[in-house]
A protein has these predicted regions:
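C-terminal substrate-binding subdomain of Rossmann-fold SDR/epimerase-dehydratase oxidoreductases
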Residues: 54-166
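Short-chain dehydrogenase/reductase
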Residues: 1-8, 38-46, 70-71, 100
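Active-site Tyr-X1-5-Lys
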Residues: 1-26, 47-56
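Amphipathic alpha-helical recognition patches that constitute DNA-binding helices
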Residues: 26, 43, 47, 102, ...
Length: 166
C-alpha cells in the first residue's frame, strides 16, 4: 500500500541526499522453513501445510480456492537479494516468479506430498484478491536472475519442516 511506496521514496531521497547505497526489493509471496506456521499470522502456504499435517479427514480453505498466487521459496528469494545487492540497480524491483497456482492447486499439492487422502472444504472467510501477479521482466533483464528451485520440491521441504515441529 501507500506505506510501502512512501518508504521506497524515502529511501531513494536518502540515497540522493546522503550518498547512501540503497536497494529496494519488492518481495512476492515467500514461503519456506523457519517461518511462522500457526497463530493467525502465517501465510497460506504455511497454513495449508500445517492444516494438512494435523488433519485426518479434511482441511478448510477460505473462499472457493480459485484465488491465484505466485509463490517464491525463501532460498530462491535469498539468491535474488544477493543478485540485487551485487548489482548497481537502485530503483524498486520485484523479486518473484512468473509461475502462479490456485489455492486449490496448492492444497492438492500439499495433500499429495503428505501422502494422505484428505478432502478440501471451502469455507467463508477472507480471500484477498482473486489474482495477484508480479511483473518480473525488469528483474530478469537487470539482474539476469530468476528463481530456479522447483515449486513442488520446495513445498516438500517446507511441509516436512512444519510437520516436524507440530
Amino acid at each position: 500500500g501507500w506505506e510501502k511506496l512512501i518508504s521506497e521514496r524515502m529511501y531513494q531521497a536518502y540515497a540522493r541526499n546522503y550518498g547512501v547505497d540503497v536497494r529496494i526489493a519488492r518481495f512476492q509471496n515467500t514461503f519456506g522453513e523457519n517461518g511462522t506456521f500457526r497463530g493467525g499470522r502465517e501465510k497460506s502456504p504455511a497454513a495449508i501445510c500445517r492444516k494438512v499435517a494435523e488433519a485426518t479427514e479434511s482441511i478448510d480453505v477460505w473462499g472457493d480456492g480459485r484465488q491465484v498466487r505466485p509463490f517464491i521459496y525463501i532460498d530462491d528469494l535469498l539468491d535474488g537479494i544477493e543478485a540485487l545487492m551485487q548489482s548497481d540497480y537502485q530503483e524498486p524491483i520485484n523479486l518473484g516468479t512468473d509461475d502462479s497456482i490456485t489455492i486449490t492447486e496448492l492444497a492438492e499439492m500439499i495433500i499429495d506430498i503428505s501422502g494422505k487422502n484428505l478432502k478440501i472444504n471451502y469455507i467463508s472467510g477472507p480471500t484477498g484478491e482473486m489474482r495477484r501477479n508480479c511483473d518480473t521482466a525488469r528483474m530478469k533483464e537487470v539482474l539476469k536472475w530468476e528463481p530456479t528451485r522447483p515449486l513442488r520440491e520446495s513445498f516438500e521441504k517446507t511441509y516436512k519442516w512444519i510437520e516436524k515441529y507440530l
